[in-house]
Amino acid sequence: MMNMITVIGFGSFGRKVVNFIKNKEPITIIDKNIDDADDLVKEGVTVIVGDATQDEVLKKAKIENADIVLILTNEPEVNRRIAERVCELSPNSYKIARAIPRYPELYMGLNIDKIINILESGAKDIAKEVEDAKLKRKLMQLKSVLIEGKKRCMKLEKTEEEKKAPLLILTHINPDPDAIASAMALKTLAERWGVDSDIAYGGNIGYDENKAMINLLGIKLLNVEDIDLDNYCVIAVIDTSTSKQLPIELPNIDIIIDHHNNTDLTAKYMDVRPEVGATASILTQYLMELDIEPSRNLATALFYGIQSDTDYFKRETSKLDFEAAAYLQSYIDASILNMIENPEISTEVMEVLAKAVMNRRVVKGNIALAYVGEISNRDALPKAADFLLKMEGISTTFVFGIVGDEIHISARTKDLRLNLGEILNKAFGGGGHQTAAAAKIPLGIFKAVSDKEALRKLVEEAIRAKILEVIGIKEEEK
C-alpha cells in the first residue's frame, strides 16, 4: 500500500524536500509555475500547474486521496487559504505546513498535524517528518483493519461455543526465527488494541536453533492442519508475500508484512519493504513508534530473528535493522539467547557433517560439492554447507541429499561474484539470498534405483553437472 504525498509549493525549499522523497512514494506537486515539469513527469512525479487555493486545482490533484500533504509556499495568506481548503477536501490526510515568521497564529483553528519552521529545520528534517507521518498512518490503517475485523466477529458470535478469535497470524511454510518473532510481535500489537489472535504455521519447525527458540521462549504455535479458517475474521500473513510460500490456500488476506521482493499477493494492509533485512525489524519499529516495551521473551525472539535473517548483520542489512537491534538490546535475555544460538547437535547432524567432509568434491580449487546420501533431517544440510565453508580455501559449498522422495540442496558462498539464489532458481527452481540458498526437486526416475551405490553416482553426477552448468564451469575446466 503506497502512500500518496502531495507537495504544494515548489520553490527552492519545496524542491529540496521533493528531491529527498521522490524515489520512495508517489508524489504530486502543485504550483503556479513549474519550469521543469516535463523532467519531473519523466521521473514519475505528477505535476499540477495551478493555484492551490482553488478547489478545482486541488481536486485535479486528487487531494482527497492524499495520505500526506505538505504546504510549503512562503506566502502567509496563501498558505492559510490552502490549509483551509485542504482541511475541507482532505480531512483524513496528515498535514505538514510551513511556519511563516511573524505569523505565529497562522494556522490557528485548523487541523494541521505538524508545523515546521524552515529556519530551524532543513529539507532533510522535513523528509524525516514525512517518513514518521507515513509510519503513523500505516499504524492507523493496521489498527483500523484489526478493529473492524473484531467488530465483524462480535456480530457473528451467538454463543460461547461460537466465540471467534478475530485474528489469525500465519507464517510462511517451515517458519524461520524472523517469521516466528514477527508473528509474536504482531500478536502483542493486536492485544494492545484489544484483539485476540492465534499464530499458525505449516510444514515443519526445522533447525535445532528454531526448536530451542520455541521451547525456551514458550512460543505457542498452531499447525494449519488443526485450525478452521472460518473461525477467524482477519487473516495476517507474516514474512512472506508470495503465494508459493503459503502453507494453506487463503480466499482473502487482510494484512501482509514482509521484507522480500517477490510479491504476488495483495491485502487491505500491506507493508512490504525489500530494502529491510528482516521482517522483525519492521515489527520492532511498530513497537517503538507505539511506545510498547517488549517483554524479555519477545525482545529476545525479535533480536534473534533480525540476527539470523541478516546473518549476524552481514547480509542485506539496512539502517532500520541496526536501529531495531540496538533498541532491543536492553530488553533481551542474554542467557536464553546464548542457549538458542548454541543448541546441542544431534548425532544425525554430526554424521551428515562427517559425510559432507568425506564426500566433498572440490572444483576450480574453491567450490565444494558434497552428496550425503539418504537422511531424515533436512536441516542438517545447511549446517553441513556452513561447516564446509569454514574449510581452508573453500569459498562456495553445495551439499545435497535425499529426504523421502525429494533431493534437497543447500548452498553457501563467500564469493561476491556468485548469487546462489539466482543459481539455484535457474538450476532447480529454488531460491534464497546471494550468499545462502536452497532448492528441492522430486527424486523422479531415480526412485526405481534400488542399489545405493548406483543411486549415489546418478544423483551426484546429475546435481553436480547442473550446478556447474549454471555457474558456467565446463567439464574440462574442473
Swiss-Prot record:
- Note the superkingdom of the native organism: Archaea
**Which InterPro entries does this entry report, sorted A to Z?**
DDH_dom (IPR001667), DHH_sf (IPR038763), DHHA1_dom (IPR003156), NAD(P)-bd_dom_sf (IPR036291), Oligoribo/pAp-PDE_c-di-AMP_PDE (IPR051319), RCK_N (IPR003148)
The UniProt entry, under PROSITE patterns, shows:
RCK_N (PS51201)
GO MF terms here are: nucleic acid binding
In Pfam terms, one family for this protein is DHHA1
Where the record annotates domain RCK N-terminal, the positions are: 2-120
Give the record's GO biological process terms: potassium ion transport
Q: What is this protein called?
A: Uncharacterized protein MJ1633
Record organism? Methanocaldococcus jannaschii (strain ATCC 43067 / DSM 2661 / JAL-1 / JCM 10045 / NBRC 100440)
